[in-house]
């Protein structure tokens, strides 16, 4: 499938994804200055580097509960989830727009628009709301090993995190580290 890598509403470059959401071909560069860090060098864009960046946007295969999500959705890898939500995230403003049916950033981004909680609910063992699961979710691009899901609470985007056995302390450690940084006036 052919896409344009976008940075908000700026076209960055054209690319092609295979059926497993791997970048198999690079096309025209529209705005090299908007390419993700680490994907561009003196020679140009390296497909390998861009693929690594793209893959790291996905939920790691080692995350607890991801196999349940993939089985329920009949997908073979977490990377396939990225394409289903156009690579949209609440961590940055990169995404992909189909070249045959371009999308508008302001109508699809998760900063301004609602999103499905189905993937996050499945990851937390709650199952989907009803019918087929909606894949338009920032949970598809919430990388890291802790289970997590995005939720809109009183109009704010909030990241809910779980912890892992045996001590289940990772999320508490993050809160403690944030509080220490705040008290020491360290930007975080």
Regions found by a protein language model. Name each.
Residues 1-188:
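Phosphate/dinucleotide-binding and metal-coordinating scaffold of catalytic cores
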């Amino acid at each position: 499938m052919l896409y344009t890598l976008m940075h908000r509403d700026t076209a960055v470059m054209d690319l092609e994804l295979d059926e497993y959401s791997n970048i198999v071909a690079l096309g025209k560069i529209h705005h090299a200055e908007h390419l993700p860090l680490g994907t561009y060098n003196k020679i140009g864009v390296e497909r390998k580097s861009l693929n690594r960046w793209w893959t790291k946007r996905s939920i790691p295969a080692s995350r607890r509960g991801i196999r349940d999500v993939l089985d329920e959705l009949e997908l073979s890898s977490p990377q396939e989830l990225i394409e289903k939500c156009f690579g949209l995230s609440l961590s940055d403003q990169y995404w992909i727009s189909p070249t045959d049916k371009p999308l508008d950033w302001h109508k699809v981004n998760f900063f301004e628009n609602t999103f499905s909680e189905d993937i996050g609910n499945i990851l937390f063992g709650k199952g989907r709301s009803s019918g087929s699961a909606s894949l338009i979710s920032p949970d598809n691009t919430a990388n890291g090993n802790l289970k997590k899901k995005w939720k809109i609470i009183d109009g704010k985007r909030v990241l809910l995190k779980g912890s892992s056995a045996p001590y289940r302390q990772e999320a508490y450690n993050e809160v403690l580290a944030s509080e220490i940084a705040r008290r020491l006036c360290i930007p975080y």
